[in-house]
Amino acid sequence: PLGVKQGDVIGFSGNSGSSMGPHLHYELRDTRTQRLYNVVSAGIIRPDDDLPPRIMRIHYIEVDTVQGIPVHSRPESYAVVRSAGGSYRLTREEPVGAGRKGYFVVEASDRRNGVGNTFGLWRLALSADGKPLFEYRMDGFEQAQSRCCDAVSYYPLQLTSRNEVIRAAQLAQSPACFYPVMEERGIVRTEAGQTRRIRIEAWDDCGNRSQLEFDILGRTASFRAEADSAATALTP
């Protein structure tokens, strides 16, 4: 490790023309484990920020299993509008239709005072009827888990979105360290005709919070995938 103190010159930086000017990236790690720290949530750096995260929209994806192979429906998207402060609501009044098993995807973004940059969420939680089902939290991770960071996102939507797109469910290979709360991998179960209350909360790493609440209603007809006799199942 290189020891430095305030006022030391640690290097000189140029500009290739694409970075808007010379700048420095840095990170703090635990020496023994090489675990990366979130320096803002840990209180090491305190930026000026009283702006709660922005919840842009949500998506619902129904899931099923065919002959042991997991399948899913296309995402159903719902617009969101801010009602007051950090409180949000859906633009529709009627409940969101839900199948027997499914999960939600949340598109959100965050800003800080005085800068035009956008930032990711620190924490996202989902509960159904007051019972916590899912929580994602980014306090840091070990270097070996860097390749798993995109596992928390819903990548098909993340590719074209300018926001952070977080899957409120755990993929099979996604590290458990990202999820301090996880019930049934985040799957929301809904019986036909059953009404449930969903609450989604989003925090930034300065402690600002936004929330969205809405009802879901169990459909009588659910997503059912059928096996394709002409298809070949490939496994890694």
Language-model regions: role of each:
Residues P1, R82-S87, G120, A125-E191:
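Exoplasmic/lumenal beta-rich domain surfaces
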Residues P1-S13:
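Short, well-structured beta-strand-loop connectors
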Residues L2, E27-A98, Y103-D110, V115-G116, ...:
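Acidic, glycine-rich catalytic/binding loops that coordinate metals and/or anionic ligands
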Residues G11, D30, D110-R112, A202-C206:
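Surface-exposed loop/turn motifs at beta-strand-loop junctions within extracellular Ig-like
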Residues S13-E27:
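Active-site loop architecture of trypsin-fold serine endopeptidases
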Residues S19, G97-G99, N117, R189-G193, ...:
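Surface-exposed coil/turn segments at beta-strand junctions on protein surfaces, enriched
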Residues G120-W122, D205-S229:
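Short beta-strand elements
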Residues R196, I200-A202:
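Hydrophobic/tyrosine-rich beta-strand signature of extracellular beta-sandwich/beta-rich modules
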